[in-house]
């Protein structure tokens, strides 16, 4: 997989913006991506050194449309911690 295929989008929530001070950045990633692939993708795209990657999997939620039921897509979220000497990712500047 290409680095741009692994990292889908940043996750911007109140919780994710509060941990930016600790140099932790939150991304939605491909469901098949491993921690190592996420690390290399972030290092390649943003030119930073990654110290740690934490990953969470979310199941799809049940949604109904009248009598028809289905599920939303499952998601995978990664919290990437960069090293102290790395520059800040400008993507998240507020």
From Swiss-Prot:
Covalent S-S links between cysteines: none
Binding partners and assembly: Part of the 50S ribosomal subunit. Contacts protein L29, and trigger factor when it is bound to the ribosome.
Record-linked SUPFAM superfamilies: Ribosomal proteins S24e, L23 and L15e
Organism (species): Listeria monocytogenes serovar 1/2a (strain ATCC BAA-679 / EGD-e)
InterPro entries, per database record: Nucleotide-bd_a/b_plait_sf (IPR012677), Ribosomal_uL23-like (IPR013025), Ribosomal_uL23/eL15/eS24_sf (IPR012678)
Keyword Transferase: no
Protein's name in the database: Large ribosomal subunit protein uL23
Keywords from the UniProt entry: Ribonucleoprotein, Ribosomal protein, RNA-binding, rRNA-binding
Ribonucleoprotein as UniProt keyword: yes
